[in-house]
Amino acid sequence: VAASGQLKSIAVGLLKIANDLRWLGSGPRAGIGEITLPEVQPGSSIMPGKVNPVIAESVAMVSAQVIGNDTTIAIAGQSGNFELNVMMPVAAHNLLESIDLLSTSAVNFAHQCVNGLEATGKGPEMVMQGLTIGTALAPIIGYDVAAGIVHEASVSGENIREVALRMTDLTEEQLDEILEPLSMTEPKA
């Protein structure tokens, strides 16, 4: 039961990663589109020319099976009477199936999906055009003023930098330093 629980944890983690990659690769003209997934299987049954994220989808299916197997194993584990458990065969079968499915799926996911991921140009553009970058202004100009800038950018369609230039006394150079995304990834003392 414990081993199956660990396999389920791995399945949940792989499912999360696969779904994140599906979302980040959604597009080409609608969706997030920050990454390009390898084209493993051409075409889509609904949209001609679209490439489906079939490897990530296969990981999702395997994860669902492993999670289901864990439920069966948990029921089998609690079904024993004293020293006898007639459900050991189904527990063993599902445990071995989960091991096989996860190991095969993880290797396939790495080789046919993760190793072929490519970043698109959308990511940096989305950061600079996004509203979340406005959080970097709060320690400098105060929460309320920063919130006003974010709101104005949201309403006007301008980016945070343009609105901050107009609504504050900050210079272009100061804003370049404050709104540098990389500086937001490190803790400050």
Residue ranges and their predicted role:
Residues V1-I35:
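Acidic, glycine-rich loop-and-beta core segments that form the ion-binding/anion-interacting portion
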Residues N19, S26-A189:
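Catalytic-core signal marking the mid-to-C-terminal active-site face
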